[in-house]
A protein has these predicted regions:
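Soluble N-terminal domains of membrane-associated systems
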Residues: 1-16
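Amphipathic alpha-helical interaction segments
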Residues: 12-14, 62, 132
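Membrane-helix interface segments in multi-pass membrane proteins
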Residues: 78-101, 138-152, 182-192
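Hydrophobic alpha-helical transmembrane segments and adjacent short intramembrane/lumenal linkers
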Residues: 105-187
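Short, functional N-terminal and low-complexity linear motifs
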Residues: 15-23, 95, 123-127
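Residue-level signal for alpha-helical context at structural boundaries
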Residues: 62, 69-70, 141-142, 178, ...
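Selected alpha-helical membrane-embedding segments in polytopic membrane proteins
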Residues: 21-118
Length: 192
């Protein structure tokens, strides 16, 4: 009897919906919970070097477990870096903010991809990995803005085009609009 059947995760009903043992555990491109550190480094490397391949292999299922845990793990690392570079309050914000922020940002991106092939949760899955990639870099003074540009204008359009199966021009326009909204919000909150 397999481990998944023993836990009751891989049943006939789950198999009928198209889930496999890999999609329950985390697909080929996803962060693997059983090996958090090595899988985290591998996920960051693939996102940085082969983003098209990462998003092509990303399972298009409405299962938030692996991306949510990836964001939480990224938030922990970001909190450690914020504690070193910014103090206690930014570190606490880095612990609490990733999941609610990802839900809000995914809503903005999903409005732009309405008519795409999949629903909101799949759009959120596309956002979760680049956001988790960005969180630790946000604490480092020079890398923060560069990471935001890379995530918002490179990774997100690639992910939206590949996963939601919308055109690349539309994906870039959605990325530009959301980046403009986020940039304007940050400017008015922190500088104006």
């Amino acid at each position: 009897m397999s481990y998944y059947r023993w836990l009751g995760l891989y049943t006939r009903r789950v198999a009928k919906r198209g889930y496999t043992r890999d999609t329950i555990r985390g697909g080929a491109s996803e962060w693997d919970v059983s090996r958090p550190f090595s899988s985290y480094v591998r996920t960051l490397g693939v996102l940085a070097v082969h983003p098209v391949r990462f998003f092509e292999l990303l399972p298009k299922i409405p299962d938030p477990r692996a991306p949510a845990l990836f964001l939480i793990f990224s938030g922990l690392l970001a909190a450690i870096l914020w504690l070193l570079f910014g103090g206690l309050f930014p570190a606490l914000v880095a612990l609490v903010l990733p999941l609610p922020l990802s839900s809000l940002l995914a809503g903005l991106y999903h409005v732009g991809v309405l008519g795409g092939r999949y629903g909101y949760v799949v759009t959120w899955r596309v956002l979760a990995y680049p956001l988790g990639f960005y969180l630790p870099f946000a604490a480092v003074p020079v890398l923060g803005p560069l990471g935001a540009i890379f995530v918002g204008l490179v990774l997100m359009p690639i992910g939206l085009a590949r996963v939601q199966e919308i055109g690349p021009l539309r994906a870039v326009l959605v990325g530009l609009v959301v980046a403009g909204l986020v940039g304007a919000t940050c400017f008015f909150l922190f500088f104006a």
